[in-house]
């Protein structure tokens, strides 16, 4: 318990003191490597991620959805790394005008199509099989969301540049990230790419923690 408290203290302190995170980071020179799609496919088929639908696992989704809707009523949202569209279920209460969810796992997308079938039928929602690093569309959005996936999508600067053309004027990038020292490196890099409109941290009694943020890139 003492270690967990110390770790959370260090994570929170490193939000505005990057040097502190570097000091205490384990395996700081080992890059984050994304798991192959076959692993994700198998885990979705086995129901490993069913737990992500539980209420205690979705506080960060609800907060990010509310923050987005506060700035962009009836928002148009593109989510990269959408899995089976769990974030949309938090966004639904805010009556989004359009939601496109992209994931490279076919089982995840198929489950999302089943989960969100009523909204798909009326054209409000679209689930797409695609690689989040290279996905392309002619649609524009108020917000492009990366929920707990940005660390698996390559260089954050390249990622933001790739999706900048899909942002409407005044649009932004939305982010949720597990509160851990190595992923926070990417948050520090993302912050300097634009204006931070919102930033918050969620802690839970069971020990979970997330960063949520909205950043308007300099385009």
Q: Predicted regions span which residues?
A:
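N-terminal, positively charged/glycine-rich alpha-helical extensions of SAM-dependent methyltransferases
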Residues: 2-46
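Conserved class I S-adenosyl-L-methionine
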Residues: 74-83
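Conserved beta-strand signature within the Rossmann-like core of class I S-adenosyl-L-methionine
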Residues: 170-178
């Amino acid at each position: 318990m003492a270690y967990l408290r110390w770790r959370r203290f260090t994570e929170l302190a490193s939000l505005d003191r990057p040097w502190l995170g570097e000091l205490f980071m384990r395996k700081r020179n080992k890059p984050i490597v994304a798991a192959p799609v076959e692993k994700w496919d198998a885990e979705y088929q086995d129901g490993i991620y069913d737990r992500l639908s539980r209420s205690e696992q979705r506080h960060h989704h609800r907060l990010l959805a509310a923050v987005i809707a506060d700035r962009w009523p009836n928002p148009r949202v593109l989510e990269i790394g959408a899995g089976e569209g769990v974030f949309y279920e938090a966004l639904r209460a805010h009556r989004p005008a359009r939601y496109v969810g992209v994931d490279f796992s076919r089982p995840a997308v198929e489950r999302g199509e089943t989960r969100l079938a009523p909204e798909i039928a009326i054209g409000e929602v679209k689930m797409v099989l695609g690689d989040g690093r290279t996905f392309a569309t002619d649609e524009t959005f108020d917000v492009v969301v990366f929920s707990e996936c940005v660390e698996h999508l390559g260089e954050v600067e390249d990622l933001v540049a790739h999706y900048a053309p899909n942002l409407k004027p005044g649009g932004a990038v939305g982010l949720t990230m597990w509160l851990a020292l190595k992923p926070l490196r990417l948050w520090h890099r993302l912050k300097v790419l634009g204006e931070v409109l919102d930033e918050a941290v969620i802690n839970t009694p069971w020990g979970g923690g997330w960063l949520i943020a909205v950043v308007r890139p300099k385009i």
